[in-house]
Swiss-Prot record:
NCBIfam families: menD. The gene is menD. It catalyses: isochorismate + 2-oxoglutarate + H(+) = 5-enolpyruvoyl-6-hydroxy-2-succinyl-cyclohex-3-ene-1-carboxylate + CO2. This is 2-succinyl-5-enolpyruvyl-6-hydroxy-3-cyclohexene-1-carboxylate synthase. Homodimer.
Length: 541
């Protein structure tokens, strides 16, 4: 067995021993030893391999697999620009704390700076965006290297999981490989062996960070539950503004009701980023703000946080009048939103979000586009407790959302996955629908596209003010006029153009026997009236 083949075999074996079950691979020559080893492990049923031809979408596929599967997922590619294409996925994984492993093949280091083909200084390419950058030395005919290879894999997985730091995230694992890059026809020599019984070479215990924080519940308190939050039993029963991807600790409070409530105290869990009404409360110097997190960072955009911890030690009792006021105002806001939706003459993204949220049932998995869809979902309904909700809210870009949805659906076998996206988000990553014949495909993924022919979110921002109407449509609205049906046909994906009523019917229909695969349900919406619709809701409050 030649050195590069031996090294790749040991690395893949140790990844499996370390708990890796899904791997995404992009074709290339320099990463051929890893490709051969991964294919062998896939055929043996030790892991599931996903082939993709585009490293950018492959990175987000791995991200979706990691988020939904709650395990590290390696994305393997050749050297050069192939590695650089992982930049957007690495950024998202960093800020969302997702255990993504970028496993890049490299040229031997002596080739750097020589003008050799497809050779760049890729070690350290991701800088501070990764938890660790780990490289292996060139493989030699030395049996003693086996322990170094396996030990390095264990370090990679520990860093990705945040085992010792409490801060999961992406890791760059760079492996320089020297020719020959294919297995010997007549392999000689032993296969590098791991620990007996399939154990990992190095085991690590997950470190726990326990920082108690005193919290008096007597002042009128609102909980702000943001993306990445853990469920906080000690906050049960408190009024909570929860983003769709975050747990609801207590009584749900509609985000549009918050300006009327005037809390005296706010407790942040996770990282809230969706609502301006929340940002205003957290920036109010008259509000005492506390932050509970599960890692070393805490959110504090305004610099207003008084104290942080990993758990609250509560004292005092919340005022029942405050609790009742929060409940009443929230229920009134919910009704106002639904009333305005019913009165609005045309379908908008809010209408589509309402139809989707109403059709979900226990066991469903929902993935929301990071632009308007996640905000629309937050305004029309809070997901039921037994619905899993995901969104790329680490950096909140629209990149790779189709691929992330495919990955999430592949990792979630317990039920169906529904993704709610805007048209620009869908078009930005339409190549995520490209799945090779024979590759694993989602069992049941429905992608709902609210198509308003452009960037609806800007209608609600300062740029959407009527005084900028002469500039808005071209540089912010960005109409495209794309035929989504033709696009889906090119990818051999089922497509239906539906109205709101048919959307609800199709989402609520009993599941047909067998695998449904991927389907796209497109709803034509309008964005020109979004500003007025939101204003009408606020007027009712």
């Amino acid at each position: 067995m030649n050195p590069s083949t031996a090294q790749a075999t040991a690395v893949v074996d140790e990844l499996v021993r370390g708990g890796v079950r899904e791997v995404v691979l992009c074709p290339g020559s320099r990463n051929a030893p890893l490709a051969f080893a991964l294919q062998a492990a896939d055929l043996e049923g030790r892991l599931r391999l996903h082939m993709r031809i585009d490293e950018r979408t492959a990175g987000f596929l791995a991200l979706g697999l990691a988020v939904a599967g709650k395990r590290p997922v390696p994305i393997v590619m050749t050297s050069g620009t192939a590695v650089a294409n992982l930049g957007p996925a690495v950024l998202e994984a960093n800020y969302a704390r997702v255990p993504l492993v970028v496993l890049s093949a490299n040229r031997p280091y002596e080739m750097l700076g020589t003008g050799a083909n497809q050779t760049i200084e890729q070690l350290g390419l991701f800088g501070s965006q990764v938890r660790a950058t780990i490289s292996l030395g060139l493989a030699e005919d030395d049996a003693g290297q086996n322990s170094q290879w396996r030990s390095a894999v264990c370090r990679v997985l520990a860093a990705a999981r945040g085992t010792r730091s409490g801060n999961a995230g992406p890791v760059h694992f760079d492996i320089p490989l020297r020719e020959p890059l294919v297995p010997d026809v007549h392999a000689q020599g032993p296969v590098p062996q791991g620990r007996p019984g399939g154990a990992a070479w190095t085991t690590t215990q997950h470190a726990t960070l326990d920082v108690p924080m005193d919290l008096d519940l007597t002042p009128d308190t609102i909980v702000i539950s943001g993306h990445g939050s853990a469920l906080r039993p000690e906050l049960a029963g408190l009024p909570t503004v929860a983003e769709p991807t975050a747990p609801l600790h207590g009584i749900p409070v509609h985000p549009m009701a918050l300006p009327q409530l005037k809390p005296r105290q706010a407790v942040i869990t996770g990282r809230p980023t969706l609502h301006r009404s929340v940002s205003k409360v957290l920036a109010d110097p008259s509000v005492a703000v506390y932050a509970l997190t599960t890692g070393p960072r805490w959110p504090d955009v305004s610099g207003n946080v008084l104290a942080t911890g990993t758990r609250a030690v509560v004292s005092g009792e919340p005022d029942r009048a405050w609790i009742n006021r929060c409940r009443t105002l929230s229920e009134h806001t919910d009704k106002a939103v639904r009333a305005q939706l019913a009165a609005h003459p045309k379908a908008t993204g809010l209408h589509v979000a309402a139809a989707v949220m109403d059709a979900l049932t226990d066991g469903d998995q929902l993935l929301l586009g990071a632009s308007n869809p996640v905000r629309d979902a937050a305004l029309v309904s809070y997901p039921a407790p037994k619905i899993r909700v995901l969104s790329n809210r680490g950096v909140a870009g629209i990149d790779g959302t189709v691929s992330a949805a495919v990955g999430a659906a592949l990792a979630y076998e317990e039920g169906r996955t529904v993704a709610l996206l805007g048209d620009l988000t869908f078009l930005h990553d339409a190549s995520g629908l490209l799945i090779g014949s024979g590759e694993p495909r989602p069992r049941d993924l429905t992608i709902v596209v609210a198509n308003d022919d452009g960037g609806g979110i800007f209608e609600l921002l300062e740029q959407g003010d009527p005084q900028y109407a002469g500039v808005f449509e071209r540089v912010f609205g960005t109409p495209h006029g794309m035929d989504l049906a033709a696009l889906c046909a090119a990818y051999r994906v089922e497509h239906h153009l539906v109205g709101l009523g048919e959307l609800s019917t199709r989402l609520s229909a009993p599941e047909a026997p067998g695998d449904r695969g991927i389907r796209v349900l497109e709803v034509t919406t309008e964005r020109s009236g979004l500003r007025e619709l939101h204003a009408a809701v606020r007027a009712q409050l």
